[in-house]
Amino acid sequence: MLSNLKSQMRKGLLEYCILSIINRDEAYASDILDTLKEARLVVVEGTVYPLLTRMKNEGLLSYRWQESTGGPPRKYYTLTEEGKQLLTQLNE
């Protein structure tokens, strides 16, 4: 029970942090991970990527593909209006 509660709280905190990061400017998943790590949050790709997908499926995020000179195309995330509204509500 306690471990499930901790897991849910952590996901909620990460979701808030991701919304805040993307609100500043569109972001590539790797940049999001770096920003979270700079804030001393212990995160791994295996947590962030599924969370980004879930948030996109919930209508909080959208993305666009951009060609990369050093590899495959990159997916850049932005907040949707719904994502901006949620972040505003969370900040109140």
Model segments located where?
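Short secondary-structure boundary/capping segments
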Residues: 53, 68-69
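C-terminal regulatory/oligomerization modules of transcriptional regulators
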Residues: 1-9, 62, 89-92
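N-terminal helix-turn-helix DNA-binding core of bacterial DNA-binding proteins
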Residues: 6-47, 66
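Basic amphipathic alpha-helical segments that dock to polyanions
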Residues: 48-50, 54-55
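Short amphipathic alpha-helical/adjacent loop interface patches that line ligand
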Residues: 26, 36, 52, 83, ...
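Basic, amphipathic "hinge/linker" alpha-helix immediately C-terminal to the N-terminal HTH DNA-binding motif
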Residues: 69, 73-91
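Glycine-centered, phosphate/nucleic-acid-interacting loop/turn motifs that mediate DNA/RNA or nucleotide
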Residues: 59
